Amino acid sequence: AANRHLCGSHLVEALYLVCGNRGFFYIPSKMGIVEQCCDTPCSLYDPENYCN
């Protein structure tokens, strides 16, 4: 998959997609995922690091 910017609701959708039933922890102020996927493009595999 090509790297892409994932911000806001798109980022949440990507987390639901890759984490599925495992769920994920979404605390924007304590996570680097916004910097990793919104400020700079990330692959769709990167959000998996934030699954429960």
Swiss-Prot record:
The lineage of its organism: Eukaryota, Metazoa, Chordata, Craniata, Vertebrata. One of its GO terms (molecular function) is hormone activity. The keyword Secreted applies. It holds the Pfam family Insulin. SMART domains: IlGF. GO terms for biological process: glucose metabolic process. InterPro entries: Insulin, Insulin-like, Insulin-like_sf, Insulin_family. Its main location: secreted. Disulfide bonds join 7-38, 19-51, 37-42. Heterodimer of a B chain and an A chain linked by two disulfide bonds. PANTHER family: INSULIN, INSULIN/INSULIN GROWTH FACTOR. It comes from Polypterus senegalus (Senegal bichir). It comes from the Eukaryota. Keywords: Carbohydrate metabolism, Disulfide bond, Glucose metabolism, Hormone, Secreted. It is found in: Secreted. The keyword Disulfide bond applies. GO terms for cellular component: extracellular space. This is Insulin. Insulin decreases blood glucose concentration. It increases cell permeability to monosaccharides, amino acids and fatty acids. It accelerates glycolysis, the pentose phosphate cycle, and glycogen synthesis in liver. Belongs to the insulin family.
